[in-house]
Amino acid sequence: MKVGIIMGSKSDWPTMKLAAEMLDRFNVPYETKVVSAHRTPQLLADYATQAKDRGIKVIIAGAGGAAHLPGMAAAFTSVPVLGVPVQSRALKGMDSLLSIVQMPKGIAVGTLAIGEAGAANAGILAAQIIGTSNEEVMAAVEAFRKEQTEMVLENPDPSED
């Protein structure tokens, strides 16, 4: 039971590694791969169609610019696909966000925020999905959420350090 983290190019890794770091925190196994919707369409088709049989339970797909990777991956598989819009230089990721979020009815992509926050949250969401059938992963997610709460409660006054 693992997660597939795919991205359109190697330059997307600095963003997408945050998804991997969150999965590491929850002890969720994953694989990473560059799979370009435009430059390697057959590789994308093969990856997505074989994902379920290879034990992939969730695909996290990050892409910038035209950002067709998440939608095309979703078109080829019944495995849940989480789309991460990678921030681009030209439009600061808005182009990526709109490309990923505007899917036609019938092909679902869970779209996250632009950039690093979206990648980290994709890792968390993938762990939550895995956790629905894995008590250890769910316990790790719940512990993380508790830590988040405690960090806020420890110092609720922003004027104090």
Curated annotation (Swiss-Prot):
Under which EC number(s) is this enzyme classified? Answer: 5.4.99.18
Q: Name one Pfam family in it.
A: AIRC
Q: Which GO terms describe its molecular function?
A: 5-(carboxyamino)imidazole ribonucleotide mutase activity
- Give the first-level EC class, as a single word: isomerase
Q: Which residues bind substrate?
A: 9, 12, 39
User: Key word Isomerase present in the record?
Assistant: yes
Q: Which InterPro entries match?
A: PurE_ClassI, PurE_dom, PurE_prokaryotes
Q: Which SUPFAM superfamilies match?
A: N5-CAIR mutase (phosphoribosylaminoimidazole carboxylase, PurE)
Q: Give yes or no: UniProt keyword Isomerase.
A: yes
Any one Gene Ontology biological process term? 'de novo' IMP biosynthetic process
Q: Which reaction does it catalyse?
A: 5-carboxyamino-1-(5-phospho-D-ribosyl)imidazole + H(+) = 5-amino-1-(5-phospho-D-ribosyl)imidazole-4-carboxylate
The family classification in the record reads: Belongs to the AIR carboxylase family. Class I subfamily.
Q: What is this protein called?
A: N5-carboxyaminoimidazole ribonucleotide mutase
To which species is this protein native?
Answer: Aliivibrio fischeri (strain ATCC 700601 / ES114)
